[in-house]
A protein has these predicted regions:
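Charged, low-complexity intrinsically disordered segments
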Residues: 1-145
Length: 145
């Protein structure tokens, strides 16, 4: 099972024939159903971790970034952000930010947020489960993480 970048590289190097789901964007299909855009950090899927509510996984990631660097004011502002774009903008202004430290923690933060949101939102959980063994790939042309 592919769980991270290293296991994906090993599977490809070993000749595994993998299937991928490429996604980008966070808007629902026109019919209102859940589609692959639910994998976006910006998809509206409220969840809680340790009694704190998050509107999107982007809010969680940016709040954790602020916590990691001890910027409680930024964390509070991120939690109140009306949109994931606003949360991302506030996250870019976290004081005390050190790229090398962020690189060590960001993957685990993203995983924790996504585990919580998929566990707590049955419709997107079902969509995720139905992807089977396919590898999810965010195909954003503008954002690496």
């Amino acid at each position: 099972m592919i769980r991270d970048w290293d296991s994906l590289k090993a599977a490809v190097a070993g000749g595994a024939q993998l299937k991928y789901i490429f996604f980008w964007g966070h808007r629902a299909p026109k019919d209102g159903s859940v589609g692959k855009s639910c994998f976006s950090q910006w998809w509206p899927s409220p969840f809680e971790i340790n009694g704190v509510g998050y509107a999107t996984a982007e809010h969680y990631m940016m709040a954790e970034k602020a916590r990691l660097f001890g910027d409680e004011a930024a964390c509070a502002a991120i939690l109140q952000a009306a949109t994931p774009a606003e949360a991302k903008k506030l996250g870019a202004q976290v004081s005390g930010f050190v790229e090398e430290i962020w690189q060590l923690h960001r993957f685990g933060i993203v995983v924790a947020g996504n585990r919580a949101r998929f566990e707590q939102n049955p419709l997107i959980r079902e969509f995720l489960v139905n992807t089977g063994e396919r590898v999810l790939v965010e195909a954003s042309p503008v954002d690496r993480i």
